[in-house]
Amino acid sequence: PRCYRYCKNKPYPKSRFCRGVPDPKIRIFDLGRKKAKVDEFPLCGHMVSDEYEQLSSEALEAARICANKYMVKSCGKDGFHIRVRLHPFHVIRINKMLSCAGADRLQTGMRGAFGKPQGTVARVHMGQVIMSIRTKAQNKEHVVEALRRAKFKFPGRQKIHISKKWGFTKFNADAFEEMVAQKRLIPDGCGVKYVPGRGPLDRWRALHAA
């Protein structure tokens, strides 16, 4: 509901003081071909939040399913990797009111109004990435459309942004292949290892001899 959209309270995570929290609806945060090597999927699209708000775990789950369905249909089930970048750790509460007649015994109104845990939400800042998709460069339109469809599951305003970075790495796409060729980056699964320009010379020689 609308009242759970705004970040009014301090973060209230599940802890030994906050017990009996229902499980978050979203359980899977990575979909598609998540084992794909870093050089297979150079293009990366982000959905970026434009508001400081809370997104429920139900909304995250709905958006994840929606984006996944469209990407599977358009790019094949092995043609992409979606990652949900938010995790719902903040617990929201509800002060249960009994509305039926004859509920005089439990109807306390605002006496003892600290609520019981109802569900979990993720707190998102302005400019924070909600969801990312990496895929091949020719699938750019599909990425934008998948994120556009997933946007309808969230309150507030989101922007879709095609990243300048290579896949899910932090290195710019135009310099990425050159850095790999110079062995300044070593592909490692869906990420890369950065080789700094300092350290023992024999390690550098061993790397370049390989």
From Swiss-Prot:
List this protein's GO terms for biological process.
embryonic brain development; regulation of translation; translation
Q: Where in the cell is it found?
A: Cytoplasm
Q: Which GO terms describe its cellular component?
A: cytosolic large ribosomal subunit; nucleus
Pfam families referenced in this protein's UniProt entry, alphabetically? Ribosomal_L16 (PF00252)
Any single GO molecular-function term of the entry would be: translation regulator activity
The name on file for this protein is Large ribosomal subunit protein uL16
Chief location of this protein within or outside the cell: cytoplasm
Tell me the function of this protein: Component of the large ribosomal subunit. Plays a role in the formation of actively translating ribosomes. (Microbial infection) Seems to bind to the leucine zipper of viral and cellular JUN.
InterPro entries linked? Ribosomal_uL16, Ribosomal_uL16_CS_euk_arc, Ribosomal_uL16_dom, Ribosomal_uL16_euk_arch, Ribosomal_uL16_sf
**Keywords, sorted A to Z:** Cytoplasm, Developmental protein, Ribonucleoprotein, Ribosomal protein
The protein's assembly and partners: Component of the large ribosomal subunit. Mature ribosomes consist of a small (40S) and a large (60S) subunit. The 40S subunit contains about 33 different proteins and 1 molecule of RNA (18S). The 60S subunit contains about 49 different proteins and 3 molecules of RNA (28S, 5.8S and 5S).
Species of the source: Gallus gallus (Chicken)
- Which CDD domains does its entry note? Ribosomal_L16_L10e
Family, according to the entry, reads as follows: Belongs to the universal ribosomal protein uL16 family.
